[in-house]
């Protein structure tokens, strides 16, 4: 009887998630890989996770779950991130992004999905082009307009696509700062955008118990993948890390362009 009750409970859990066992296994695998990339590169979890989850749940739900997972994993390593980040720029960019995120969520509901894919593709390609530009000279201090544009666009993209990375990554990658500081600064910004999008989703009635349950189920592989990715980051040089980040941006741009093909 106990075994039967256990099987019934497991079935009920899958029913609550709305996923078949095979789909859930795929989601767990995707979460692990996406989190490993995040731990190594400092970003990329949403870029990989949202499209894959979008095959199993509605695109809006994939964005919501990805944002919830970004919040949970960001809080789990907040102390290390806070100590290593360039807090002056990260807090400004993160604050502006939090303000802009609800407007991105509004756009997600208002714009035609076909146009949404075009805009996301353009942003992803532009981010890769910016990374290829020459790095800033030593001692360069970003202009206020550059900081503001980075924060606002990151917030809009967080709400719109769950992808704050395209404007934030080039901003830090082109700065003459160590890879560890750039990575931590990006992670601090992404924690802010995850918090804003999660709160906005709840306030707008877009996030519910099902999304929280799916995020809770996926958090285990997310934590493990992020931990292993962070360990791998400690074994690569600054130069190699920057190339890996550029390649990840190129891959995201390619995927976004492929999705435009009918």
Regions found by a protein language model. Name each.
Residues 74-84, 105, 119-144, 230-231, ...:
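Transmembrane helix exit motif
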Residues 1-22:
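Short, strongly hydrophobic alpha-helical membrane anchors
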Residues 228-249:
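Interfacial loop-to-transmembrane junctions
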Residues 58, 112, 178, 237-241:
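A helix-boundary/kink motif common to multi-pass secondary transporters
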Residues 17, 24-91, 151, 155, ...:
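Small-residue-rich hydrophobic segments that form or flank transmembrane alpha-helices
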Residues 70, 97-101, 124-127, 190, ...:
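Residue-level recognition of pore/gate-forming positions within transmembrane alpha-helices
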Residues 62, 107-108, 117, 157-163, ...:
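Hydrophobic alpha-helical transmembrane segments in multi-pass integral membrane proteins
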Residues 63-66, 117-120, 183, 242-245:
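Hydrophobic/aromatic positions within or immediately flanking transmembrane alpha-helices
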């Amino acid at each position: 009887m106990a075994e039967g009750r256990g099987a019934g409970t497991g079935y009920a859990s899958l029913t609550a998630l709305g996923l078949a066992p095979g789909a859930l296994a795929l989601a767990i695998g995707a979460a692990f890989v996406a989190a490993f990339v995040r731990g190594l590169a400092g970003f990329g979890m949403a870029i990989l996770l949202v499209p894959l989850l979008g095959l199993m749940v509605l695109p809006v739900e994939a964005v919501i779950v990805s944002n919830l997972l970004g919040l949970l994993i960001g809080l789990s390593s907040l102390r290390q991130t806070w100590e290593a980040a360039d807090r002056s720029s990260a807090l400004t960019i993160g604050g502006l992004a939090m303000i802009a995120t609800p407007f991105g969520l509004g756009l997600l509901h208002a714009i035609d999905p076909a146009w949404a894919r075009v805009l996301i593709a353009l942003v992803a390609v532009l981010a890769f082009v910016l990374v290829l530009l020459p790095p800033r000279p030593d001692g360069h201090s970003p202009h206020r307009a550059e900081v503001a544009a980075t924060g606002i666009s990151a917030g809009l993209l967080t709400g719109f696509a769950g992808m704050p990375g395209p404007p934030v990554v080039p901003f830090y990658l082109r700065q003459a700062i160590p890879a560890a500081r750039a990575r931590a600064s990006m992670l601090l910004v992404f924690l802010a955008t995850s918090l804003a999008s999660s709160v906005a989703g709840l306030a707008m009635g877009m996030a519910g118990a099902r999304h929280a349950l799916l995020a809770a189920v996926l958090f285990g592989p997310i934590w493990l993948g992020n931990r292993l990715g962070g360990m791998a980051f400690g074994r690569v040089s600054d130069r190699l890390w920057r190339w890996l980040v550029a390649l990840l941006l190129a891959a995201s741009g390619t995927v976004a362009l492929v999705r435009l093909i009918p």
